[in-house]
């Protein structure tokens, strides 16, 4: 699932079909070159659901994860913009440093594309983006 937010919090329904290719493992790959995403003013974010039900939103360069036998380091994801996507909620092993908290578990996650290019920096932005995500999910 790709969720795109405008700067005012509304949902952007941009067609990203040109970016989606079939991966070697049969999963859909969102291949968005880092330079292209920066030029178009977009940044990719990961939203992971903690076991207690709360969410964390963070730039992909702060996370590493494994999906269907493929491993993505944070810096790798930020540079290549390659993410394995499945229909609906996807469960992958996500290794996230959340402040002093080291999280490693199977979390569902979605890739969030923010057209403003503004980084998620600090608790306020994280809460705002999680609220946008929850609002979007409620519309489904």
Put a short name on every predicted segment.
Residues 1-121:
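N-terminal assembly/attachment segments of tailed bacteriophage virion structural proteins
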Residues 136-140:
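Heptad-repeat coiled-coil alpha-helices
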């Amino acid at each position: 699932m790709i969720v795109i937010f405008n700067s005012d919090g509304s949902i952007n329904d941009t067609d990203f079909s040109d970016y989606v290719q079939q991966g070697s493992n049969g999963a859909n790959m969102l291949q968005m070159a880092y330079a292209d995403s920066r030029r178009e003013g977009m940044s990719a974010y990961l939203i992971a659901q903690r076991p207690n039900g709360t969410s964390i939103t963070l730039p992909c360069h702060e996370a590493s994860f494994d999906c269907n036998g493929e491993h993505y380091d944070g810096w790798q994801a930020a540079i290549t913009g390659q993410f394995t996507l499945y229909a609906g909620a996807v469960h992958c092993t996500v290794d996230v440093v959340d402040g002093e908290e080291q999280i490693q578990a199977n979390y569902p996650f979605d890739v969030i594309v923010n057209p403003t290019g503004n980084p998620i920096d600090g608790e306020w932005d994280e809460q705002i983006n999680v609220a946008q995500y929850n609002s979007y999910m409620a519309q489904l």
